[in-house]
A protein has these predicted regions:
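Catalytic cores of nucleotide-enabled group-transfer and carboxylate-activating enzymes in metabolic
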Residues: 2, 6, 19-34, 180, ...
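Beta-strand-turn-beta hairpins that frame and shape the catalytic cleft
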Residues: 1-2, 23-29, 152-161, 180-189
């Protein structure tokens, strides 16, 4: 198993983790989250960088929660050729029906505003680029499959997914992914997503995870809960 961190490593936004495993004699690839980089021109440029592989080669995406720095580039990924399922909780899917169209609208608005200022001779610097359209968002939403907390879901032969409650926002999850590669014992890979704090009124405490062979944990609250 190989894990490649394409964002949110040494930085806060742009959560994108690519996992490669060997199953039934061939290499399989999947993503955990596919978020947008946020925070100025440098972040905007990162959102335009090509992946080190073709999106068509991805088998599926596991999405921990709806925040844009974890989900916001999914329409771009799908527009570039990814056709597989995107797994998340029902609450996350309901939030994304609002957040992703809104993201497309804001991007288009930024471009339109810049074009008006450019025509008036008042624009300085690089022109913003819309990463995806409302139509591409609608196509992306059709690729989602809901997996609820505590439900075991086979994503591929040798890969099982279970979501636990992360207590971060509505629908947020800790993703438990059990992987049995060719000729190897099963390993549990746990992706924390963003973890909530204990004792909050509006959200439940994050679930406790008893064991993991590989743990990928966020570093804002991951050492406090």
């Amino acid at each position: 198993m190989k894990i490649q961190f394409l964002g949110a490593a040494g930085e806060v936004t742009g959560s994108r983790h690519c996992v490669e495993v060997m199953l039934s004699g061939r290499s399989r690839h999947f993503m955990v989250d596919y978020g947008m980089f946020q925070g100025g021109r440098e972040a905007a440029n990162k959102n335009l960088e090509p992946l080190p592989f073709s999106p068509k080669d991805l088998d599926f995406v596991v999405l921990t929660h709806a925040h844009i720095d974890h989900s916001g580039l999914l329409p771009r990924l799908c527009a570039q050729g990814f056709k597989g399922p995107i797994y998340c909780t029902g609450a996350t899917f309901e939030l994304l029906k609002i957040l992703l169209p809104d993201s497309a609208y804001l991007q288009r608005s930024d471009v339109d505003r810049a074009e008006r200022k450019q025509k008036a001779g008042k624009w300085r610097g690089e022109m913003p680029i819309a990463l995806y359209s409302r139509e591409e968002v609608e196509m992306t939403l059709a690729q989602f499959e809901v997996v609820e907390y505590g439900q075991s879901k086979e994503l591929a032969p040798g890969i099982q997914l279970e979501f636990r409650n992360a207590g971060h926002i509505l629908g947020s999850t800790i993703a438990l992914i059990d992987i049995t590669e060719d000729g190897k014992q099963q390993k549990r890979c746990v992706f924390s997503g963003d973890i909530g704090m204990k004792g909050k009124v509006l959200m439940p405490d994050p679930d406790l995870i008893a064991s993991a062979d590989v743990l990928v944990v966020e570093s804002t609250y991951g050492d406090r809960t």
